[in-house]
Amino acid sequence: MKVMRTTVATVVAATLSMSAFSVFAEASLTGAGATFPAPVYAKWADTYQKETGNKVNYQGIGSSGGVKQIIANTVDFGASDAPLSDEKLAQEGLFQFPTVIGGVVLAVNIPGLKSGELVLDGKTLGDIYLGKIKKWDDEAIAKLNPGLKLPSQNIAVVRRADGSGTSFVFTSYLAKVNEEWKNNVGTGSTVKWPIGLGGKGNDGIAAFVQRLPGAIGYVEYAYAKQNNLAYTKLISADGKPVSPTEENFANAAKGADWSKTFAQDLTNQKGEDAWPITSTTFILIHKDQKKPEQGTEVLKFFDWAYKTGAKQANDLDYASLPDSVVEQVRAAWKTNIKDSSGKPLY
């Protein structure tokens, strides 16, 4: 899969302009939140700028920050990898919808090791993040990698320092595959990490792993590839070693029942070559739009992304949503996103 080598900055900005009423009217949108989808949002915004002239400014500040900003009405849309509960959505008057499917991978810095050479399973990975496995040549790791020469090197564990949807996805997986992690740490955008150096954003973790020999850190796949980081294979729910690819992220989503809720948990799914740490990512928007022109432009941007952004997402190794899910999202926009008079914005 061809990977775009664009550097992902913390602030992703693109310039666009389009209006239903005048080609000279400029629409400017602001969004903030998850760093997990920031590479594809950057690419979409850049292309949308060239095609329409509209402005979209997206700040990758972490999912927790995105939720806070949309609740505070300081942005036009928020972004989070951790879906809000139905109760929280109702309380804040928000609607959430998915955009793309991606994967969290384990990036490692072991001298001489290439991507896909090291295999880990969920139990072993959890024990690393619990601080129980401290060296790369530990017996548990060696057993999964017969024939691979592992260094007697300390493992430098890297995790997120900020509230993070990527952490939510990662800890959701660990809670399914490591009983001690489930009982003592649990799942969340922020947890009480047993050990580890904290990095801000996916790019912060990638930078730590790049600098620290012996490091391991969890990042969205595009960040590992853009930073030329080696990443591991994982043992799937079917007991097979699998690689992170756009196709295998899509495989993890095949069994999901999207008709009941958009908030699907795609971690540790069974299915041919399903990547174990797969997730969709979400946009948050107010249902009752006080500035309907802004709400309309948000929907236009993501409608455009659904129609024309699939190849760009795939080039960055995200999987597109199934067409049936996109149609469900559009139908939900019509019934949920309205102006103060109750008129649908889509």
UniProtKB/Swiss-Prot annotation:
Query: Which positions does UniProt annotate for phosphate binding?
Result: 34-36, 63, 81, 164-166
Cellular compartments annotated: Periplasm
Expression triggers: By phosphate deprivation. Positively regulated by PhoB and negatively regulated by PhoR.
Q: What is its main location?
A: periplasm
Q: Which GO terms describe its cellular component?
A: ATP-binding cassette (ABC) transporter complex, substrate-binding subunit-containing; membrane; outer membrane-bounded periplasmic space
Q: Which GO terms describe its biological process?
A: DNA damage response; phosphate ion transmembrane transport; phosphate ion transport; response to radiation
Q: Which UniProt keywords apply?
A: Periplasm, Phosphate transport, Signal, Stress response, Transport
Q: Does the keyword Transport apply?
A: yes
* MF-aspect GO terms: phosphate ion binding
How does the annotation summarize its subunit structure? The complex is composed of two ATP-binding proteins (PstB), two transmembrane proteins (PstC and PstA) and a solute-binding protein (PstS).
Query: Function, please?
Result: Part of the ABC transporter complex PstSACB involved in phosphate import.
Q: Provide the family line.
A: Belongs to the PstS family.
- The name of this protein is Phosphate-binding protein PstS
Provide the species name. Answer: Escherichia coli (strain K12)
This chain is encoded by the gene named pstS
